[in-house]
Design a protein with these regions (language model features):
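Active-site neighborhoods of metal-dependent hydrolases
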Residues: 1-130
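Short, well-ordered loop/turn and helix-capping segments at boundaries between secondary-structure elements
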Residues: 8-12, 125-128, 143, 147, ...
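A glycine-rich phosphate-binding loop feature that marks nucleotide/adenosyl-phosphate handling sites
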Residues: 20-28, 141-142, 161-165
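Acidic, glycine-enriched loop/beta-strand segments at the rims
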Residues: 80-83, 89, 134-138, 146-183
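C-terminal cap of metal-dependent C-N hydrolases
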Residues: 90-97, 102-103, 165-212
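Feature representing long, continuous alpha-helical segments
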Residues: 99-100, 117-121, 125, 139, ...
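Short, solvent-exposed cationic patches
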Residues: 214-217
Length: 217
């Protein structure tokens, strides 16, 4: 229903787009509005779909008692919630108006593997399996978000653009981040250049001081 709404807006000339990541669970703080009254009914689930990412209950699925205790005493605690449907995520990632996003949240190295794994995972599990073409995947990771944010010097290889380049092996690239080890680097990404400077080699950071944050658009 949501994607049909996006299609309707786009057909009427509105620049509507959205992003998605290639995982079937989301992550947020246990105190977020996502878990406000009615969430169990909305997701048609029980408390055991929620896994705690940190603290004394790290790695455990919730009971009602644990959920209420942590939400009351530590609302910032990160969780992973296993309620997303594979068919819905796959449909979204094949939609022409959807960009790839990591939506990365990390707290002391704990959190969701999407922060480290989204981009190599898309190439491994969607391109190599034929769900997306390599062109489509690269576009939704580069040109689409750059265009959406108005970053005219980003997202493409052309004269005058910033020399931000990722060199990867499409046959080897894959993610290794898991819900137990969410920061594990992938493989098959040989080089990353930011502004023409080497930032990473073989999925390992060489320089972490390159680039700059986008404060205002």
């Amino acid at each position: 229903a949501f994607l049909r709404m996006v299609d309707s807006y786009r057909m009427n000339g509105l620049r509507v787009s959205c992003d998605c990541y290639p995982y079937y669970a989301f992550s947020t703080a246990i105190g977020s509005t996502t878990y406000d009254e009615g969430w169990l009914e909305r997701y048609h689930c029980g408390y055991d779909v929620v896994e705690l990412c940190e603290g004394r209950y790290k790695g455990r699925r919730c009971t009602r008692e644990i959920f209420e205790e942590v939400r009351r005493d530590w609302p910032e605690c990160l969780t992973v919630c296993y309620v997303m449907q594979e068919s819905d995520v796959d449909m979204a990632l094949r939609h022409p108006g959807v960009m790839l996003g990591s939506d990365g949240i990390m707290n002391g190295g704990q959190g969701h593997p999407r922060a480290a794994g989204s981009f190599p995972r898309l190439l491994a599990q969607f391109v190599r399996t034929g769900k997306l073409s390599l062109y489509e995947a690269v576009r939704m990771m580069t040109a689409m978000p750059a265009d959406k944010l108005g970053l005219s010097n980003k997202g493409s290889l052309q004269v005058g653009a910033d020399a931000d380049v990722v060199i990867f092996d499409p046959d080897r690239v894959r993610d290794h981040a898991t819900f137990d080890q969410p920061t594990s680097p992938g493989e098959g990404i040989d080089y990353v250049f930011i502004g023409g400077e080497l930032a990473a080699r073989d999925c390992r950071v060489v320089r972490g001081d390159l680039g700059r944050s986008v404060r205002k658009l």
